[in-house]
Amino acid sequence: SGPAPLAPPRGVPAMAAPRALLAAAVLLSPLLSPLLSAGAAGAAPAPAPRNVSVLLEPGSGRLRVLPGRLPAAVAWASLDDRIPHVGWAFLEVTTNASYNDSLQAYAAGLAEAAVTEQLMYMHWMNTMVGYCGPFKYESEYCQKLRDYLEANLGWMEEQMGKGQDPEYWHQVRLALLQLKGLEDSYNRRLDFPRGRFTLAPFGFLLLQLGGDLEDLESALNRSSLQRVLGSGSCSALVKLLPGNRDLLVAHDTWNSYQSMLRLIKKYTLPFRASAGKSQIPGSIQVFSSYPGTIFSADDFYILSSGLVTLETTIGNNNPARWKYLDPRGSVLEWLRNIVANRLARSGPEWATVFRRFNSGTGLVVEADLTELLYQQGYWASYNVPYFEEIFNASGNLELVRKYGDWFTYDKNPRAQIFRRNQTLVHDLDSMIRLMRSNNYLQDPLSRCRGCDPPQNAENAISARSDLNPPNGTYPFPALRQRCHGGTDMKVTSSGMVPSFGLVAASGPTWDDVPPFRWSTSPCSSLLHMGHPDLWTFPPVKVHWD
């Protein structure tokens, strides 16, 4: 059968414009004035934020979702949908520490879906509809995937019931309960699970699986893979300003353009580390995300523990490692990510939590690179492993032998652009310019050996693969014309982190290249419900009341 979330929310026509769906004030910072020349002129006024509360009925013990912010609620959610104006919607979800953790987690999911259900529906239609649904002829792969996910969920359920390692499994259970609440709320089925519970393998769980799914498709022999050889999946930069004035941390997501219904979320979930224990260090999290997704998936987080965590994908290109995949004994990456963000108080602690129960192919090497940051002034990440052990184990040597320097850590185009241009970063403004940069027609470092034409829009800090000609010659698929590229930019600093502040820009870069417009792009036939047509959004400074 097809995935549960195929039906639109009740009372919502399938192609409805997003309904007025946060108490986050989005202010255009004067600091960013050079980048704000193209505001949303002529756009309709933004709708008022939408608020809901989840209440526990004292007599029946049932949960109800009601409009407004009611003081005795288990959870509250508030959504300010500014996608037509700035390319982002802003969501706050807060739970009440006077209730038990399980109730809080489930209610958090209920509240989030209640205010974002239209965005969830449109994002599902744009990105997941038909995945292992009734009309796709991938029945053998889909059955293998269903079996894998069901076995994995079953194994985790066993671990939660054993009572061993309660801190870890408590957080896993809370994350799954939150997802269950999200799904139940969307399907108008509010029923708090008091014991064991199940998740539909092809329901909203699929929206959590992004990076895991890329690997599972290869391992389970899906014939049409999502992952494209050489395809990057993010650029990140840690930059120490001259004189150690400030530390800036920035991240660009690279993704399919169909994924551009975007949220910035603030979760305040005062869970306990385990029964009767103190509150978790990462109870407050601000992160860039997507409808129906309870973690970042980009990933970029600012945490109440004082940590900022981010990643760029390192894919596995070594088929010999797939034999290590086992649904029993592993926790998928999205969950390990959530648990590490909640429990860790430091970088080493984060790595220790994250490496446990890795998905089989996982190889974690941890190191403190502070000295290197002091020496070279920056640290960049661009989908190529830094550590030799990971580089070799994931099959990169073979790619270097076959395709050359593009697959190396130090001579990859982005490695060279970061090395050259990071010296130009002296404040927030110049950091944003670097992270949004794509001057592929003029930049000699964007040239591609073996490509015709030689200048390639993939070879930049923020890719614009839609600009590559459809009839060019390219040595491997990532360099072709694709509806894929840098889809955002987020940056924070040591000064902004205590108040969970950040600056964020949504959509493909348009600093040195033509802006992306769905109606005139080679991607116009792809489903993009709820998206603005023209993507010319300035960076916005995000404050929280």
Residue ranges and their predicted role:
Residues 2-28:
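Classical eukaryotic N-terminal signal peptides for Sec-dependent ER targeting/secretion
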